[in-house]
A protein has these predicted regions:
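Short beta-strand edge/turn micro-motifs at domain boundaries
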Residues: 97-122
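Generic hydrophobic alpha-helical segments
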Residues: 9-10
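C-terminal and inter-domain tail/linker signature
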Residues: 29-30, 43-44, 90, 110-115
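A solvent-exposed, acidic/Ser-Thr-rich amphipathic alpha-helical stretch
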Residues: 6, 19-73, 81
Length: 123
């Protein structure tokens, strides 16, 4: 799997809203920061955060666009992206967008997400 293939697989896994599909793509030491500023350190905390979002946002669609590869080497890769999501929260339509930065680490021949920072888009 290349870093580009990882991004496609990660986007598809997120779209299923199932941790069991996302989990193989997450590094044990992952650190994820959501656009609301919450930080989740370690795979177990990332799992809790993702599962909370999956249960809160019904019928979610999530997409990434405008990928920019900052660097891609044999063991690490870094990319920037725009993200958009929409779904239903408490029976009401909801949506959001922002910018993200992700760091991938190759471990045991497989790319895994080790860091992701999601933020709001500047006006």
């Amino acid at each position: 799997m290349t870093p580009e293939e990882f991004v496609r697989a990660y986007g598809q896994a997120l779209g299923t809203q199932s941790w069991s599909n996302v989990e193989p793509l997450i590094h044990e030491d992952a650190c994820v920061t959501f656009s609301n500023g919450t930080v989740h350190k370690g795979k177990s905390q990332v799992k809790i955060a993702f599962e909370k979002n999956f249960s809160l946002i019904k019928d979610e669609t999530y997409s990434m666009s405008n990928l920019h590869w900052v660097m891609s080497g044999p063991e690490t890769a870094v990319y920037l992206f725009d993200f958009q999501w929409s779904g239903v929260i408490n029976d009401k339509p909801a949506s959001g967008m922002g910018r993200g930065t992700s760091v991938l680490f190759r471990e045991g021949g497989r790319w895994k997400l080790i860091a992701e920072h999601l933020g709001l888009k500047a006006n």
